[in-house]
Amino acid sequence: MIALAVISAAVIAVERWADDSRYVTVEICVEYESALAHADQLGYDSMQSYLSALKESGVVSVGVSQVALADFLLERGVSAFHGDELLDHDALTSVQHPALRSLLDRGLVNRDSLYLLPGDPELALLLESASLKEADRPTAVRLHTSGTSSVIEILSDGPVAEGFQFGFCKHQVQTVADAGLKVVPRLMNPKSASIDAIDAVLAHLDDVEECTTVIFSGTEAFGSPHNLRYTAGRLLEMGIAPGMVEFSVQAGDRQLAQLVDYEVIRIHSIVPSEYSVLSAREMLDRLFRAVSERNVRLLYLRPHLIEPQLEDGNALDFINSLRYRLESNGYVMGPAQAYPRSSPRLLEPLVPVMALGAVALFVLIVLYVYPMPALPQVGLAFVASLAVVGIAYLDKLLARLLLSLGVAVMVPAVAVLVSVVRVSGLSTRRAGHPLISALRGWLLAVFVAVAGGLVVAGILSDRSFFSKIVQFLGVKASHT
């Protein structure tokens, strides 16, 4: 049975190798705001020419954030004033704007409100729609008119209105697309996270061509905490994979990953505060290892922060070096994709075989410690198998983790027994030269260790582990 378990694991390993050989596309993504700052650092006269240079260096996409209220108003040529600013200004110099003057004369200017001018019904409607995404209690939006002039009042507590989101800047999206680069939207979770708010945000993705990946900003996964299932359904329906930034915990991200069947993109991003303490070589090594060791497939860069750390060349050269290193190791630059399949096709039917192999290994160790007749051996194996089936009935993932942990702990013990103790019940050998005997024992121990590792890898061969959403710490346990 142990031999069958090892053979089953080898079969799954072949399938995994076939999948891994197709999972080699890496996407280098640059933050738009950082790109803007870097273009200024290098003295480019237009963003278009800078983005073209980025593409030549190996960049595939640009991360674009949702438009906040300040940028939205600037784009529309609208000025914003807090109520306390207006009252203080009017105390020194009389405000002449007719609609504001009317409110001031009637004592209707609220210190906590935000006033926008010029106002118009269309803008008021957009702001009212945006307010529905904020908190459970929508922020009141009022249009005040006096003659031909008007002003919009947003009643809010503190900076609530400044948190309004208005989709994506069409100019930014178009500029990126014209350069032949892909847009990766960055989504902020609406404060209310209601279904209507989620739909409103996702509707803005219609402005982004070939959107296949989104990255979440802030401390929460999109749709958290109550509508993650709905969000997952919409993302699957739209063919969009959520990005999971490693080492960054966002509320609800693991649950969302599970709901989309772990069809996620692993992302590595050097946080802004880390750039200043890393050399160019350290950054290059870190980014490459993220891809080669941890299945990261999207590298999120901020070139304006890379630039000061370079002794030679510029950040465009750095990105080109990163691309060269990746391509030299068999990777291909392009849009990132989730792992090809949820799991190898033969995983489900072969997991029980590997589980029985783990049970047989357990019985073998027990027999070494406490020899027993055949009938009790069968009873022990039956009870152990029944325990595995019971746990699997309650939670298949937990059963696989426990089986893997058991194998990871038992295999080193067996390796020691067959190579050092040389107990006849676990290995048979002929007398010979001590060096030859030692070499045989060592080779047998290596075989046992490799076989055990193969079985553990086989049991854990699915996308949840490749994406690092679910992690197995059995190797550490086996060394404690």
Write out the residue ranges for each language-model feature:
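Transmembrane alpha-helical segments and their cytosolic interface motifs
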Residues: R16, R345-L356
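Soluble extramembrane regions of membrane proteins in the secretory/endomembrane system
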Residues: W17-L346
